[in-house]
Regions:
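A beta-strand edge to alpha-helix "cap/lid" segment located at domain peripheries
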Residues: 1-29, 36-130
Length: 130
C-alpha cells in the first residue's frame, strides 16, 4: 500500500515537472482521456484544452512546484492534496497575465490497467486561515 502511495506521489512530482517544461507529450500520457481540470476561478478545462495551453505557447512557467503533499489511496483511486506554487505568464486574445500564485490543489488519480493517470484536479486560491 505504501509503495502505491509513493508511486502516486512520484507521478504528481513528474506532472509538476512536465507542467514547468510544457511537456505536452508526457502530459498526454498521464492525463486520463476524460480528465477535467477546475481552475482557481471555477472554470473547467478538458484534457485537450489543458494540453493546448502548452501546445500553443499561451502558458509559460518560470517556476512550478508542489509541497505540503498528502496522498491517500482508495482502492484504484488516490487523492493528493498539496500546495501548488506557480510563476509565469499566460497570454491569449484578452491580453497578457502574469502569474505568481499559490493554490491548494486536489489531484485525483485513477489506476487503469496497472498504470496511474491524473483524472482531475481542482485549484483553490490560498486566502488565509478561516
Amino acid at each position: 500500500m505504501q509503495d502505491e502511495a509513493q508511486r502516486v506521489m512520484t507521478l504528481g512530482e513528474d506532472w509538476a515537472a512536465a507542467e514547468l517544461r510544457g511537456d505536452t507529450a508526457f502530459l498526454r500520457e498521464i492525463l486520463a482521456d476524460d480528465f477535467v481540470g477546475v481552475g482557481p476561478r471555477g472554470f473547467t478545462l478538458t484534457r485537450e484544452q489543458w494540453l493546448s495551453r502548452h501546445g500553443t505557447g499561451s502558458l509559460r512557467y518560470e517556476a512550478f512546484g508542489l509541497d505540503e503533499v498528502q496522498t491517500r489511496l482508495f482502492g484504484d483511486a488516490a487523492i493528493t492534496v498539496c500546495r501548488q506554487s506557480a510563476r509565469g505568464v499566460y497570454e491569449d486574445e484578452n491580453g497578457r497575465f502574469d502569474l505568481d500564485d499559490q493554490f491548494r490543489a486536489t489531484l485525483v488519480f485513477v489506476k487503469q490497467d496497472e498504470s496511474w493517470q491524473l483524472a482531475g484536479l481542482q485549484l483553490s486560491p490560498i486566502l488565509g486561515r478561516p
